[in-house]
Amino acid sequence: IDYVYQHADYIAVNISSPNTENLRNLSLSDYFSSLIEKVMNKREQLAKGADTRKPIVLKISPDESEENFEKIIVKSMETNVDGLIINNTSINHFKGVKGGISGNYIKNLSEKNLKFARSICDENLTLISSGGLMTKKDIENRLKLSADLIQLYTGFIFRGTDLLKESLEIQ
């Protein structure tokens, strides 16, 4: 955080990358509570020196159990995390396939997790929907499901600026 704070518009704490060994263990309650408290304390220290408070958002795995997902959301609200990115790449996929899956393969899971998160979080916690956003209709649906923002990756890779143009047409 020290290195990026002055340059960033916001800081994403990614505890969900399927490509970093043991990183997802940070979402377990013992590790997560300590980690997020340290991150938020560091942010407050840096905000005082910089006269600006950069938002901290947490990127969550779509593979969390409902129980742990709820614990992460509750702890995020308790520590004043500014937002959650729901979701990252999934590791639950076809037998024998290595790496993470994204795009259409996690669309339904991302929608389910967004609905669940919205049902337990307050309006002060920004929800950023990611995962399976391939079309304008997908984006409209996430906004209807009460996403505050969207984050495009796979859809942008496959559709390029056409998807961006379509998303700007949404009222």
Feature roles, as predicted:
Residues 1-48, 55, 61:
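Metal-dependent enolase-superfamily TIM-barrel catalytic cores that perform enediolate-based chemistry
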Residues 8-10, 81, 147:
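A structural motif
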Residues 11-14, 56-60, 84-86, 125-131, ...:
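Hydrophobic faces of well-ordered beta-strands that scaffold small-molecule active sites
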Residues 15-17, 83-93, 139-166:
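Glycine-rich phosphate-binding active-site loops on the catalytic face of alpha/beta enzymes
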Residues 64-78, 118-123, 133-150:
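Catalytic cores of alpha/beta
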Residues 107-110, 129-141, 151, 156:
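Recognition helices and adjacent regulatory flanks at domain boundaries
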Residues 19-31, 69-123, 163:
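Glycine/Thr-rich beta-alpha phosphate-binding loop at enzyme active sites
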